[in-house]
Amino acid sequence: ELPLPEDEAVSVFGSGAPALLAELGQEGLLVHRSGGWRWNVSSSDGPWEEIQIRGSGGDVQIVDTRSGSIIGSVPQDSADSQVFPDAIYVHQGRTFHVLSLEEGPTRIAYVEEVRTPLRTRAQDATSLRVISVDEEWVSPDSLVHWYRGTVDVTRQVTDFDLLRLPGLEYISNTQLDMPERTLRTQACWYTLSPATMAAIGIDKGDVLGALHAAEHASIALLPLLANCDRWDLGGLSTNLHTDTDLPTVFVHDAYPGGAGYAHYGFAHAREWMERTYQAVSECQCHDGCPRCIQSPKCGNGNEPLSKIGAKLLLGFLVEHSPFEEIPRKLSDTK
């Protein structure tokens, strides 16, 4: 592993980084040598055995009640939407009925195999609160503001649709009593005024659909740049956010504390928006499809979406996104 200089640690992890590095040094995990802090290679274990890079808490184990064997696992952040009670879980072509999702230090989903044409699709309610803003970039005409910082994402799976194959025919909806879960992580987001949305040709009734579609497409394209997966990211789009009082699109890391993906997106926003605009524009569908603006993880059933509005918005953002300029750190203005 490369050494971590203290000045770089402060710029990435904040002013508390030196104290944390010193504490890790006292515990014998790190050593300080010329060039910065390094992993203590004399330790019996490597860092990959001690630290889960993709988050904390481990995966939720899925146990077949008939055999007692573990058939698979799902990440903590997606367990509520994949293995909630009465969900139909598909694993390697086999279908399982979820009997229960047990809470505790180790979360376990108990399932039994069934043969059924039924499928389930969870719906959720998500809210996001801005905790701090670390960097800001303003377009030269002041029409778009980009930010990077810390956010709290609160999500609750509220209900699920029961569907039938083929065609995923809707059968019924069932309410769920699932807990709210809050994730503190890193995000990047942009804001623009309703007047700007109107000026670039987006009808008032299509504003939310345009923002929502742009969010989906952006999340689908960022993994091509940031070396991650769509499931490593989350997002929220709204035509009036409580912390910005403006139409806003957020893209956040799906792991506690962040994993650097949203930070990368902020630093390379121009290329990110160019790639996203190109993907949406080149897709031959008319109203949107899984290739461009529909998301397999959308908690709102991919509604509302406006492909026309997304193309207008993304095309505008190509010329209103950070690229080679150095974004303004808020600490530089104090």
Regions found by a protein language model. Give the residues of each.
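Cys/His-rich metal-chelating microdomains
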Residues: 295
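Short, structured interface segments
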Residues: 35-41, 108-110
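Short cysteine clusters
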Residues: 283, 288-292
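Basic amphipathic alpha-helical segments that dock to polyanions
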Residues: 16-32, 38
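Short, non-ligating residues that shape and space the ligands of small metal-coordination modules
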Residues: 298-299
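Short, solvent-exposed helix-loop connector elements
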Residues: 7-8, 292
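Extended Lys/Arg-rich polyanion-binding regions
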Residues: 1-7, 22-23, 27, 45-283, ...
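Conserved phosphate/pyrophosphate-binding and hydrolysis machinery centered on Walker-type P-loop NTPases
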Residues: 10-17, 266
